[in-house]
Design a protein with these regions (language model features):
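Charged, low-complexity intrinsically disordered terminal segments
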Residues: 1-270, 275
C-alpha cells in the first residue's frame, strides 16, 4: 500500500476498529493526502461494530467510502446470506490480495477466544489481478451507485517469464450472478477427480449435489479427506457441520479435526490447490 501510485481499493466483509485497522487506516490516509485514489467498500452486517463517525473520519481525509447493503435493508432480506463476504485489496491494478483474512486482531492470533488463527491469504501479481480489479469496480458501482470505468482501473500487465509460475484464474459468484459459478466449478472438479479431494473448511454444509458428488467420489476410490476446526465461531453452523461429516464418514471419507484452533479458509484441493 505504501508504494501505491494511482489507487488503492479495499473491500472487506469485517473491519474492526482495533490496532490492525488503525495501522491500515493510517497508511490509507497518508496515501490519500498524496493524491492516491483510495476507496473502501465494507459490508454493513459484517462491519456492524464500526460507527458512522469511523467512516466519516475517512471521508474527511479524502477517502471514498461505500456500504454494501445498509443494515436496515439487509435485515429485511429473506436470504440473510445476501452479504458481501469478499476480502479484496487491489493496488494500482498490479498487485492484489485475496483470501480468508478480514481486518481484526483475531485474524493475527491476538484474540483470547480463538487464539491461533489458521487462514490462507494470497498476494497475486500479473494478469490475474485484472479479475480482482474488475470485481471490485462492479461491487463498488453497485454499492455506491456510481459508474467507475473499468478502463481507468486496469493496467497493461507486464510480460512475466512463465517459467515457475502457475496459472491463476479468479472466479466470483453471488446473488447478482445468473449462474452458480463457484458451486458449478467445485462440482466439476469433484466429478473429474481421479486421485484425491482434500477439503479444509470451517463450515461443511454442502448442498445435495456437492454432498452426493463427494460420496460418489469416495465410493469410487478417490481419497476424500475433510478437515474442520476444533473451535467454532458460529456454534449452530458448527454442529450442522458434524451432521454432514457423519454422512461422509459413512461413505468412506476420512475426516479430521484441526486441534490448534479455528480454521477460517475454505480450501479444497484436487491435484493442485484451489481456494
Amino acid at each position: 500500500m505504501k508504494r501505491a501510485k494511482k489507487y488503492i481499493h479495499v473491500q472487506y466483509y469485517i473491519i474492526r476498529n482495533d490496532e490492525v485497522w488503525q495501522d491500515i487506516e493510517k497508511v490509507l490516509i497518508e496515501k490519500a493526502h498524496e493524491g492516491v485514489e483510495v476507496r473502501v467498500l465494507f459490508d454493513s452486517m459484517g462491519c456492524r461494530t464500526m460507527h458512522k463517525r469511523d467512516w466519516d473520519r475517512l471521508k474527511c481525509e479524502g477517502i471514498r467510502v461505500a456500504e454494501f447493503f445498509p443494515a436496515i435493508l439487509g435485515q429485511l432480506q429473506m436470504r440473510v446470506n445476501y452479504r458481501n463476504h469478499r476480502k479484496i485489496v487491489v493496488i494500482d491494478g498490479k498487485v492484489g490480495f485475496v483470501g480468508g483474512f478480514n481486518v481484526g486482531r483475531e485474524y493475527i492470533g491476538k484474540d483470547e477466544k480463538f487464539g491461533y488463527w489458521r487462514d490462507t491469504h494470497l498476494c497475486i501479481e500479473g494478469a490475474a489481478v485484472t479479475s480482482l480489479a474488475v470485481r471490485f469496480v462492479l461491487d463498488w458501482n453497485y454499492a455506491a451507485h456510481e459508474n467507475l470505468f473499468l478502463e481507468d482501473h486496469l493496467f497493461e500487465i507486464p510480460q512475466y517469464d512463465r517459467h515457475g509460475f502457475d496459472p491463476v484464474q479468479i472466479i466470483s459468484s453471488g446473488p447478482d450472478s445468473q449462474t452458480k459459478t463457484i458451486h458449478d466449478n467445485y462440482l466439476h472438479l469433484i466429478h473429474s477427480a481421479r486421485n484425491h479431494v482434500y477439503i479444509q473448511t470451517p463450515y461443511f454444509i454442502p448442498d445435495a449435489s456437492i454432498l452426493d458428488a463427494l460420496k460418489i467420489a469416495s465410493r469410487s476410490g478417490v481419497d476424500v479427506r475433510i478437515m474442520i476446526p476444533c473451535k467454532p465461531d458460529h456454534p449452530f453452523v458448527y454442529w450442522a457441520t458434524y451432521s454432514y461429516i457423519g454422512e461422509m464418514v459413512a461413505a468412506g471419507a476420512k475426516c479430521y479435526v484441526y486441534n490448534l484452533s479455528l480454521i477460517h479458509i475454505s480450501e479444497p484441493t484436487r491435484r493442485t490447490p484451489i481456494s
